[in-house]
Amino acid sequence: MTKLIVGLGNPGDKYFETKHNVGFMLVDKLCKDLNLKFTVDKIFQSEIASTFLNGEKIYFIKPTTFMNESGKAVHALLTYYGLEVEDLLVIYDDLDMEVGKIRLRAKGSAGGHNGIKSIIKHIGTQDFKRVKIGIGRPKEGMTVVHHVLGKFDRDDYITILNTLDKVDNAVNYYLQSGNFEQAMQKYNG
């Protein structure tokens, strides 16, 4: 078996550690813990790192297409590696959840998230595993775009770092056990 673990975000220093980039932050953490280095693949418009865990090939992906076109990279990689949507796990921000909350889901709608909309459009289904990380709603008078492309304040950043540890554990549990349902039961909350 092979798995594709995709963190959503926007490439470039301008977007480093913004709220919209928590998917990138988590994939970076997973790869750092495993001592993996990313290589840029221009054909697949992604940064890619890979390893074997329990005899399974695992690809860690950060699309470089910008958030709203993430589906192009995800579809191309699924096709190239001959993978099914069952082999896909996407990690991304959710502004409808409180900062630091996580939710693992086996499938679901885009919920207004343009990166997820793009993936659904390109792979033709919303039936793929995902981990949502709460970034909270914009403060009164702030646009959604300004909010998601903004940095965390100090307290929220500390909360997110703790959350990334929890999500790291959840993803590793899934990769070790191969059982996403059990990971959902153990880590949702």
UniProtKB/Swiss-Prot annotation:
Keywords from the UniProt entry: Cytoplasm, Hydrolase, RNA-binding, tRNA-binding
Keyword Cytoplasm: yes
Protein origin, superkingdom: Bacteria
Residues of the active site: H20
Binding site for tRNA: Y15, F66, N68, N114
One BP term from GO: rescue of stalled ribosome
Residue ranges crossing the lipid bilayer per the database entry: none
Catalysed conversion reaction: an N-acyl-L-alpha-aminoacyl-tRNA + H2O = an N-acyl-L-amino acid + a tRNA + H(+)
EC category name: hydrolase
Record keyword tRNA-binding present: yes
Chief location: cytoplasm
Site (Discriminates between blocked and unblocked aminoacyl-tRNA): N10
Subcellular compartments: Cytoplasm
GO molecular function: peptidyl-tRNA hydrolase activity; tRNA binding
Family the UniProt entry places it in: Belongs to the PTH family.
Described function: Hydrolyzes ribosome-free peptidyl-tRNAs (with 1 or more amino acids incorporated), which drop off the ribosome during protein synthesis, or as a result of ribosome stalling.
NCBIfam families: pth
Complexes and interactors: Monomer.
Protein name (database record): Peptidyl-tRNA hydrolase
Gene source species: Streptococcus gordonii (strain Challis / ATCC 35105 / BCRC 15272 / CH1 / DL1 / V288)
Gene transcribed to yield this protein: pth
